[in-house]
Design a protein with these regions (language model features):
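Generic hydrophobic alpha-helical membrane-span motif
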Residues: 11-14, 36, 40, 93-100
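Cytosolic, membrane-interface loops and tails of multi-pass inner-membrane proteins
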Residues: 7-24, 83-86, 131-132, 202-204
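Transmembrane alpha-helix/helix-exit interface in multi-pass inner-membrane proteins
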Residues: 76-81
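Structural signature of hydrophobic alpha-helical transmembrane segments
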Residues: 1-3, 53-66, 107-114
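Multi-pass membrane catalytic core of lipid/isoprenoid biosynthesis enzymes
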Residues: 14-72
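Hydrophobic alpha-helical segments, chiefly the membrane-spanning helices
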Residues: 5-6, 30
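C-terminal membrane-associated helical module and adjoining short loops/tails
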Residues: 85-204
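Short, motif-level signal for alpha-helix interfacial/capping segments enriched in acidic residues
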Residues: 7-14, 64-69, 159-166
Length: 204
């Protein structure tokens, strides 16, 4: 589903779906499907899979995820005009995937899921993997980023197929992409602020 979500918008724009079907709101349908795949499905997994969360916290945590995610999806600027996600972009399926693969403890899972619920309200600009125009103007870097995204998908799929064994190469590639994604997101959020502040100080 992550792969489909990564390419469906690009394919729709490629074939000009909005022009062919002007009365169909593809963005609305995309949000409905995304909420089901990224929020409801992982919450259901947390509810039915033993050992993911302490028994007393399963319902409160899954409720917090669904409510904060609903808030995120309802924001008219959840996707910014320059094609970034504002706040943690509800990657709950990816989060739960890693918790399952690495068999993290229930306490760690509870803390991380609670933290990510809070991060929804923190206006960090997270990279939109299929919309890179405002991340870089370099065509080479855009192609490289798409290749990295594809490699991430392959490595994560291999981790799932080989579970419970964990291959160091696939782990490194998968987590390396996550690290790069977070770095680019925080860099793109805070570097312009620091740059503007330095420029303003120099003018003074």
């Amino acid at each position: 589903t992550v792969f489909i979500d990564a390419v469906d918008g690009s394919l729709a724009r490629l074939v000009h779906v909005k022009s062919v079907l002007p009365k169909i709101d593809g963005a609305l349908l995309d949000n409905i499907v995304d909420y089901l795949n990224y929020v409801i499905t992982p919450c259901f997994f947390l509810l039915v899979k033993p050992g993911m969360l302490p028994a007393d916290y399963v319902v409160p945590i899954t409720a917090a995820i669904t409510i904060t995610s609903a808030y995120q999806f309802c924001q008219d600027d959840a996707k910014t005009p320059d094609h970034f996600f504002k706040g943690f972009p509800c990657y709950w399926n990816i989060t739960v995937f890693y918790m399952y693969i690495f068999n993290t403890s229930m306490i760690v899972n509870t803390v991380l899921l609670s933290l990510f619920c809070v991060l929804i309200f923190i206006p960090v600009k997270y990279v939109y993997p299929s919309r890179l125009d405002y991340l870089t103007e370099s065509r080479v870097l855009k192609i490289l980023m798409h290749c990295c995204s594809a490699l991430y998908g392959i490595s994560s799929f291999c981790l799932l197929v080989n579970y419970p064994e964990t291959n160091k190469l696939w782990v490194s590639l998968s987590l390396g992409y996550v690290g790069m994604y977070l770095f680019l997101s925080f860099y793109r959020t805070y570097y312009p602020m620091f740059k503007a502040k330095i420029t303003a100080n120099n003018k003074d």
